[in-house]
Swiss-Prot record:
The gene is YUC11. Involved in auxin biosynthesis. GO terms for biological process: auxin biosynthetic process; response to ethylene. Pathway: Plant hormone metabolism; auxin biosynthesis. This is Probable indole-3-pyruvate monooxygenase YUCCA11. It comes from the Eukaryota. It is an enzyme of class 1 (oxidoreductase). Its cofactor is FAD. It comes from Arabidopsis thaliana (Mouse-ear cress). Pfam families: FMO-like. It catalyses: indole-3-pyruvate + NADPH + O2 + H(+) = (indol-3-yl)acetate + CO2 + NADP(+) + H2O. FAD binds at G13, A14, G15, P16, A17, G18.
Amino acid sequence: MEKEIKILVLIIGAGPAGLATSACLNRLNIPNIVVERDVCSASLWKRRSYDRLKLHLAKQFCQLPHMPFPSNTPTFVSKLGFINYLDEYATRFNVNPRYNRNVKSAYFKDGQWIVKVVNKTTALIEVYSAKFMVAATGENGEGVIPEIPGLVESFQGKYLHSSEYKNGEKFAGKDVLVVGCGNSGMEIAYDLSKCNANVSIVVRSQVHVLTRCIVRIGMSLLRFFPVKLVDRLCLLLAELRFRNTSRYGLVRPNNGPFLNKLITGRSATIDVGCVGEIKSGKIQVVTSIKRIEGKTVEFIDGNTKNVDSIVFATGYKSSVSKWLEVDDGDLFNENGMPKREFPDHWKGKNGLYSAGFGKQGLAGISRDARNIARDIDSLVCGRSSKNKLSK
């Protein structure tokens, strides 16, 4: 049985991007519905993140539109603090997602987006008809585990994606290999080490390592100075803090951290103590994995190591291509990412938008939400809402 539902704007995804977009539309009195496949909003934060997680950027760079963090909130907000903030945000702006909705298909027909959704609670098919559709599932739709010879068919230990990792308590005394040296990888490696696991970390590429304070200084200065000048200052501060990290297998890219982010989309890694553990020898840096047999991992440099568990902090991928049958909005590529780079990534044709795909973190989500709401408002009401949404 199918249930037909008509709405002006359909938002797919109830993470920060979906909540922010709905909130901006609600402030303009534009009808919208948010559908979410999970049982809660912000499920990546509530159900798929590790316990010690904090926002890696200062709070002023992470707040959503129209609701700054309270002045007594710590500069770097904890996981629980951010979850509470998101829940309060949804309540304040009357965002009420429909949970347990799994989008099966979406296509454009006769001036409307037709979106078929399975209500996992009732098993009914809901068919939404919307003039505008916002893909707000973001860049972190699904965890990625690379294909490694022997991993699936031979490995005798346990392997998991970083989204399944909570803390290192059950890994105490175990030999654990962390794959990936981004923020999740470095922080999980540090957490494991502090829980008395024997930790190695795979560093497959060049990486900038900075502190939260250095990043905060850099982001503040970018408002006034060229990116290359800010990069030089941040690298000087990083050199004073860490000295020569290449001695420990952490080689910096040729471009500075902020320029590298603009070019590659890859952020600097924020150190929470992992570099100190690496310098002391408590965490060993290793090269890329070549193959796995039993519990033995062979690396591309010929070295081997026996491990009990592997944690893959190897990132995420978009899930848009699974349900967007034909991109009649000319917005997404075959990998479910926008065809156009930031800042032109958020708007397609035929009323299709993307929120949270600009590789700009939470600050980018806020910009996307405001841009989308203003654009829809101008198309529906023929008015400028710039002032109303800039507060």
